[in-house]
Amino acid sequence: MMEDEDFLLALRLQEQFDQETPAAGWPDEDCPSSKRRRVDPSGGLDVIPFTQPRAERPLSIVDESWETLDPNPDVRAMFLQFNDKFFWGKLSGVEVKWSPRMTLCAGVCSYEGRGGLCSIRLSEPLLKLRPRKDLVQTLLHEMIHALLFVTQNNRDRDGHGPEFCKHMNRINQASGTNITIYHSFHDEVDVYRQHWWRCNGPCQNRRPFFGYVKRAMNRPPSARDPWWADHQRSCGGTYTKIKEPENYGKTGKSDKQRDKMPATEMPKKSKPPSSTSSSGSQDIRNIIPFSGRGFVLGGNAQIPTNKQIQSPPKAPPEPLHSPPDSPLLPRLQLNEDNLKRLSSGTSNIPRKRSVGNTNAFINVNGSPVRISNGNGSGGKQRSVRDLFQAIVLKSPDRGASAVGSSKSSTDASTADYRSNSALDAKPSGKTSLITDHLSYTISGPKTLSAESNISKYFGGSAKTDVQDSKLKTFGSPQKSAIGTPGYVSKAFGSNQRPDSTSSGIRNTGSPQRSHASATSGSSFKHFRGPAKPESNFPSPRNIGSPRTSGTTPSGAKKRSWEEHNSERVFDYFQRTVGESATSTDKKREEVRSEAPPPVRDQQANNPPAQITVHCPVCHIRLPESTINDHLDSCLL
């Protein structure tokens, strides 16, 4: 008995397994065990053939049971499912959204050309009143339009031609839907058309509209409608509004009346904004009152005198003094005027000029270039020089020390030179006149007496030769009077042209005008170029060497033989200086009075100043002529 029960249990388990296996997808024809022995409960082992029932067909996408299973479907999820199932995944870039204002049609598919955006809009007001089946069919309808747009197969004139019908029939057969060309729920469309107009002309008796115009928006018929011109030709009547939603006009009037009511006539029930809200937060104006000055629009902006808030008097600011360890800077006292000037200066911060300002920028090949101010640097330099001169002259200690040091160095050098031969003493008047004239034409008259003594010799301070470095050496002890070839060449025409030197000598009023100009040219030649072997005058290489008389110390015994071979130049200087020694003061006055014309001549002969601009990319100052090449290399 136990064996029979085990055998029967095994048969039942096998039968259950065979029933579950075909349901997984195996066909009955391929499975030889489709016929199983069924055990008779009476004990007989007769084989009873039977067939396995086929699996039921899955629910259609428009089945009625979906109304309860998924009453609020996700439109985007449905779109992705239908795209993979019916459209081969070609609509992945299409957008699907609800439209809350579209009430004329159920759905719209818009396409912006090749490579543009394809968008599907579904009417939320219409489809929320329809069953789920209409939503699915409307979505599939618009997806067919999107497929024709994306695949560039939209050759149908009205959009619902053979290509559209081909895909429509294919999906209807595969899914059991009933996709049509036009939707059939017109009643829902009419529900939202609550603004009616009717024409009083002949068209009120014509089909199909009988003169009615129904719209969901309060937009009366006008020339903006495409059919307006045809209506004016065929009918010529005017439209009058005959219907609108309830309380539509009253709500608008109440809002307008509420806006026209003044603030004093507002109902007492309306609470001010400073009241405590329901959330528990309180307006800060209840804690900290407003202490400013308010203005009422349309009324008197004056505040009563009793309500004006009097600010406490301000204490006068204490004068601030500069620290005692800064003797160069003058002691400044900040009074009320200075404080006002400082406060106004902080408010008047220069704004950054726009590149569109044609007064500040110019267009150079499409790039903005700032227009530089040519007089800006000169004015700043003069103001700084004047400031330092005023500071040094005002400070007695620094001024006395600077003048004393310059005088002591000048006296020592003069004593050394007096102990030498007459070659150094006699031409000093001529060279002093020339050097004084050159220094005057460069930077104007001298301010210190030490400069006239230093200018007697060819190698004085750098101040006499290069006036641009005046700021660096002003107030410091003068350098030792050691003449170098560079200084001599600068004093005799390195930075000055020969014609300017000759013109300076010509203005002195000497009777030997032509001879003086020729002599200056010859001296310029001797001092610039190397000396020839037959020349008796020492070469620039020897000038400034220990063997020359101009730099020989007072304890030197004797000059070298090379210096004794220059009798001709010595005689020339002795003759010319002797003639002009009596009228030195008069010549200096004439040179100073007539000095400005050579300055103008020199400025006229000099080339114009080169305009520099800023690179808008790397902010480097460079000449204007090279800005284009620089921008090409900078923008790469």
UniProtKB/Swiss-Prot annotation:
One Gene Ontology term, aspect cellular component: chromatin
Ranges of compositional bias, category Polar residues: 302-311, 341-374, 492-523, 545-554
Placement of sequence motif Nuclear localization signal: 535-566
Cofactor(s) essential for the protein: Zn(2+)
Record key words, sorted: Autocatalytic cleavage, Chromosome, DNA damage, DNA repair, Hydrolase, Isopeptide bond, Metal-binding, Metalloprotease, Nucleus, Protease, Zinc, Zinc-finger
InterPro entries: Rad18_UBZ4, Spartan, SprT-like_domain, SPRTN_ZBD
Activity regulation field: DNA-binding activates the protease activity: single-stranded DNA-binding specifically activates ability to cleave covalent DNA-protein cross-links (DPCs). In contrast, double-stranded DNA-binding specifically activates autocatalytic cleavage, and subsequent inactivation.
Active-site residues annotated for this sequence: E142
Binding site for Zn(2+) 1: H141, H145, H160
Bias (Basic and acidic residues) ranges: 241-268, 559-570, 584-593
UniProt note: phenotype after gene disruption: Morpholino knockdown of the protein causes severe development defects and accumulation of DNA damage.
Span of domain SprT-like: 76-183
The protein's Enzyme Commission number: 3.4.24.-
Chief site of localization: nucleus
Gene3D superfamilies in the cross-refs: Classic Zinc Finger
Residues reported in the UniProt entry to bind Zn(2+) 2: C615, C618, H630, C634
Residue ranges of the motif SHP-box: 290-298
Sequence motif PIP-box, residues: 451-458
Subcellular location: Nucleus; Chromosome
Family in the record: Belongs to the Spartan family.
Subunit and interaction comment: Homodimer.
Protein function: DNA-dependent metalloendopeptidase that mediates the proteolytic cleavage of covalent DNA-protein cross-links (DPCs) during DNA synthesis, thereby playing a key role in maintaining genomic integrity. DPCs are highly toxic DNA lesions that interfere with essential chromatin transactions, such as replication and transcription, and which are induced by reactive agents, such as UV light or formaldehyde. Associates with the DNA replication machinery and specifically removes DPCs during DNA synthesis.
PANTHER family tied to this protein: DNA-DEPENDENT METALLOPROTEASE SPRTN (PTHR21220:SF0)
Annotated domain remarks: The UBZ4-type zinc fingers mediate binding to 'Lys-48'- and 'Lys-63'-linked polyubiquitin.
Protein name: DNA-dependent metalloprotease SPRTN
Organism expressing this protein natively: Danio rerio
Gene designation: sprtn
